[in-house]
């Protein structure tokens, strides 16, 4: 029977499936961080259980840490408590932790692939909704809740119901200046933020194949923003080249055997998908969100839609509420919107490719007078090291940006990098919900190049019209 890639991954990890019951899956890799793991470890202690497979779990500090200091003792409040708890719990159980004293530390979905912990064919879970990022490698990866974190620590398994399969094909090649972020925002704009509900999405097509692994991670990272359980891209030579010689990747004959297996990880030609969506790559322009969910997005040259012209009453009400919060009116041209802050970072867009794109825009330019702050936050210590080796940090600083240490930073209002009330931000993160970047903060999701350009010109511009240096 022909199968989709998702079906192959799911079926090959079933440990036990009783008739009429939810299957139990084996979990190859478990990634943890300081926010969703403390209660899970407490649960283990209360039940007098041990971590079943210590070598399958890896931790990092990212969500609540400061991007300005690297000393745990200088952290404050809840952040300090969470970080110290993670340190205590990993030491007590023998779990490998990439803490803030190491250059390997970083955002969990940047650190995992960098270290070769993310491999094709795996099941990967983390107490974080953007775990779908790892699906870029042909792994079945999804976020889980804290009680499930405890269950995986104790059993290395997880009950998981089958999802539907969706194929999203992006045909042809994108135009110059169009990035992975534009592709995924255009997809979400077409499907809406609920279009993938109940599905695992496989992204395919020439435009997807042309992406680097960094770009593919950006696409899969935001699969959750269209309601999908997970996102997948079948592994290929681009995948193998990225993984070769990574610290935790197979070596020698094991590598050869692994690649031979990985090459089988693709949907069969006659596999049946429950839902199929197609986009033409040539039609995708630079994207900017105008509302309070990632599906409220249009091309930079368009005007904000009029809610009264929306046939769906739910969509109309959502748009009206979003415009009231975001402080904009229907018919406004996106290129007339000024920004107060710029954030370049997050598990969506904080890798070296993203920073290079931002630097190409900022080189030789200065921050616009109306822009209060530009934060550039690398996704890991290794990304930071590489960026500084290339001199990107000097470009950012010369342009008036702040060059920070690795962390989730302003993606979410959980640390000390936040927007002020009613400030407007051009952000490379993945969510533009109300208050996501700080109380009453207003977020517009864009690519790294678009964010950098907004910082230099003080408003949204079409990156295709900006000279790159």
Swiss-Prot record:
Supply the gene name: leuC
Q: Which Pfam families match?
A: Aconitase (PF00330)
Q: Could you tell me what the cofactor note in this record states?
A: Binds 1 [4Fe-4S] cluster per subunit.
Which superkingdom does the taxonomy of this entry point to? Answer: Bacteria
- Signal peptide limits: none
What does the record give as its pathway?
Answer: Amino-acid biosynthesis; L-leucine biosynthesis; L-leucine from 3-methyl-2-oxobutanoate: step 2/4
What molecular functions are annotated in GO for this chain?
A: 3-isopropylmalate dehydratase activity; 4 iron, 4 sulfur cluster binding; metal ion binding
Q: What is this protein called?
A: 3-isopropylmalate dehydratase large subunit
Q: Name one GO biological process term.
A: L-leucine biosynthetic process
Enzyme Commission identifier(s): 4.2.1.33
């Amino acid at each position: 029977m022909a199968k989709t890639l998702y079906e192959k991954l799911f079926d090959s990890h079933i440990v036990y499936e009783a008739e009429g019951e939810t299957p139990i899956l084996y979990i190859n890799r478990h990634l943890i961080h300081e926010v969703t793991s403390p209660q899970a470890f407490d649960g283990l202690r209360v039940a007098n259980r041990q971590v079943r497979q210590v070598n399958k779990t890896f931790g990092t500090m990212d969500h609540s840490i400061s991007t300005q200091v690297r000393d745990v003792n200088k952290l404050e409040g809840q952040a300090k408590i969470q970080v110290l708890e993670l340190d205590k719990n990993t030491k007590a159980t023998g779990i490998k932790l990439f803490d803030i004293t190491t250059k390997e530390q970083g955002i969990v979905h940047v650190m995992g692939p960098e270290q070769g912990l993310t491999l094709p064919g795996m099941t990967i879970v983390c107490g974080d909704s953007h775990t779908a990022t790892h699906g870029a490698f042909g792994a079945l990866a999804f976020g889980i809740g804290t009680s499930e974190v405890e269950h995986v620590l104790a059993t290395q398994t997880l009950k998981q119901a089958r999802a539907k399969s969706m194929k999203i094909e992006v045909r042809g090649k994108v135009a110059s200046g169009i990035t992975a972020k534009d592709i995924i925002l255009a997809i979400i704009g077409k499907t809406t933020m609920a279009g993938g509900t109940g599905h695992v999405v496989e992204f395919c097509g020439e435009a997807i194949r042309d992406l680097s692994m960094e770009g593919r991670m950006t696409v899969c990272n935001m699969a959750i923003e269209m309601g999908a359980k997970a996102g997948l891209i079948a592994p290929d030579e681009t995948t193998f080249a990225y993984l070769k010689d990574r610290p935790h990747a197979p070596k020698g004959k094991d590598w050869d055997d692994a690649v031979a297996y990985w090459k089988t990880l693709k949907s069969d030609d006659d596999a049946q998908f429950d839902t199929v969506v197609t986009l033409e790559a040539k039609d995708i322009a630079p994207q900017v969100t105008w509302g309070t969910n990632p599906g409220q997005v249009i091309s930079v040259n368009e005007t904000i839609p009029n809610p009264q012209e929306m046939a769906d009453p739910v969509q109309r009400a959502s748009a009206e509420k979003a415009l009231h919060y975001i402080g904009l009116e229907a018919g406004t041209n996106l290129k007339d919107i000024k920004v107060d802050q710029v954030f370049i970072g997050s598990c969506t867009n904080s890798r070296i490719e993203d920073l290079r794109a931002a630097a190409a825009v900022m080189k030789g330019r200065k921050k616009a007078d109306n822009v209060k702050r530009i934060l550039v936050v690398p996704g890991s210590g290794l990304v930071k090291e590489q960026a500084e080796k290339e001199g990107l940090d000097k470009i950012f600083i010369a342009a008036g940006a702040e060059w920070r240490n690795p962390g989730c930073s302003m993606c979410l209002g959980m640390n000390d990098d936040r927007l002020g009330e009613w400030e407007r931000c051009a952000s490379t993160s993945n969510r533009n919900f109300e208050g996501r970047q700080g109380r009453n903060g207003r977020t517009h999701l864009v690519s790294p190049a678009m964010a950098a350009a907004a910082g230099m010109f003080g408003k949204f511009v079409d990156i295709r019209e900006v000279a790159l240096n």
